[in-house]
Structure formats: C-alpha cells, structure tokens
A protein has these predicted regions:
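Pocket-lining segment of extracytoplasmic ligand-binding domains
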Residues: 92, 165-166, 171-257
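Phosphate-coordinating loops and pocket residues in cytosolic domains that bind phosphorylated ligands
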Residues: 11, 134, 198
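A generic structural signal for well-ordered alpha-helical segments enriched in polar/charged residues
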Residues: 15, 55, 155, 236, ...
C-alpha cells in the first residue's frame, strides 16, 4: 500500500451524524452556504468536484461558496469568525475548540483516517519517540498532529517540555522546515506528509492509527440553529459523496492527487 493509499481509505463506520433535537421553525433561507474544502478531507474534494450541494440547493436559489482551509485550526478560525458556515476538522481539534468557547456544533463524521504521524528526514538518527528529547519539533498548535505528538511523548515518558516546539501557521510550513533542516522532526499531516515521503524520502518514524481522531464536519452553532432544515440536506450530500468515495476509490485518488 502506498503512502497515499494507506491514508486515503475511508472507514466504513464513518458517516455518523450528531444531530440533536432541532426547531421546526427556521430563519429566512440564506443566499449562500459557505463550506470548506481541504486536502486533509478528500470527501470534501469529491463533494466539490461532483457538485452535489449545488444540485441540492439549486431549486432554492441558494449558492454554494467553497473556501479552502489548510488545517483544523484554520477551519476553526474561519468558523469562529463567521467566515464559513461548515468546516472540517479533526475530532480532537473540534473538542478543544468547543471547550475554549468556539461556538461550533459537530454534526457528522466523514472519515476515520490515518492522517498524522511523526516525521523526520531520511538520514536522521531519530528512530523512536524517545529520540525527540532535546530536539526541535514543528507543529501547528491545537491540531490533531499536535495532540498526536503530545500523546506520543506521554507514552514515551516525556512531555512537551522535553522538546523545543516550533509553532507554524500551516502544516506545509512544518514539512518545509524539516526538509530544510531547520527542525529535527515534524508532527505531520497528509497529503503534505505523503508528498515529502515520495519526493524527499522523509520517514514516518512513529505511527499509531488508533491515536488519529475522526474527521469531523462542524457547523457554526448560530447557522445550525437558524437553518436547522438545511443541515440534514448538507449531510445527505456529504453522505452521498462519502459513499461514492468508498465505491470509486480510484476516482477519489485521482481527485486527491
């Protein structure tokens, strides 16, 4: 299984919804629905490619506006600022954001991926988590890779105080720092992680699929409250895309690449 294949697979157990009781009354319909697409969420890329949402809401004259997000923290920032109505994140990032007051509602599980690991260069002497002691490690704060790193350190009897964290804004920045030699390791995320494996020989020295959290679709709480009738329709389109992805893996892979 290739670097891309092993982390593109979508869990059959995904597609869970978290909708609770909602009001039967909704505010006036919105003029547009703003939703993210992300390379860490292949289902969103296929959803955008197939136009399922556009077809669903054409009869209501509701436009669909796609906004690219580059990380869970990016999507959560957009949701918190009201720049998008739906954003995809890792489950752990959504939980932390909600605890910290971000008004979001997690409504759907779109995948159970293995999208994060700890990465180093091909010639590095780092081979296990314990080797990170005293090393510089790049990460995006508050994302699944960051939480994955913290858990890995804990499992090895270390904490974040035993390393030198190098915080970056985007996951791609962390990968670039690693390849340039500015850091010793990187809490990576696909597809950037797979790209560096293929192009630069980067090594995934620590993997733990069970420590990767689910891919979650979140809605702005205000939007979910005001437009409760729209939420199930968005989820139906998402589920159609997810099921299509499972049945047409080669096509999903081409869209992803």
């Amino acid at each position: 299984m290739t670097a891309i294949d092993r982390r593109l697979l979508l869990a059959a157990a995904s597609g869970l919804t978290f909708l609770g009781p909602s009001s039967l009354w909704a505010a006036d319909k919105p003029k547009e629905i703003r939703i993210d697409w992300a390379t860490y969420n292949p289902v969103s890329m296929l959803l955008k490619e197939k136009g399922y949402l556009e077809k669903e809401f054409a009869k209501d004259a509701i436009a669909i506006r796609w906004v690219q997000t580059n990380s869970s923290s990016n999507a959560l920032q957009f949701l918190n600022a009201g720049s998008i109505d739906f954003g995809s994140t890792a489950g752990s990032a959504a939980l932390v954001a909600r605890i910290n007051g971000n008004p979001i509602k997690s409504i759907y599980v779109y995948s159970r991926p293995e999208w994060t690991a700890l990465v180093t260069t091909k010639d590095s002497k780092i081979n296990k988590v314990e080797d990170l002691k005293g090393k510089k490690v790049a990460m995006v704060r508050g994302t699944d890779p960051h939480i994955f790193l913290v858990r890995a350190l804990f499992s090895a009897g270390l904490t974040d105080k035993d390393i030198t964290p190098v915080l970056v804004q985007q996951h791609a920045d962390g990968g670039n720092l690693l390849i340039r030699g500015d850091v010793d390791a990187w809490a990576g995320l696909d597809p950037m992680m797979a790209q560096h494996e293929i192009k630069d020989g980067a090594r995934l020295f620590y993997r733990n699929p069970a420590a990767n959290t689910w891919g979650i679709l979140n809605a702005r709480e205000e939007f979910a409250k005001d437009h409760a009738d729209i939420i199930p329709r968005v989820l139906a389109a998402y589920e159609e895309a997810r099921r299509y992805s499972l049945a047409h893996y080669d096509e999903l892979k081409q869209i992803f690449i």
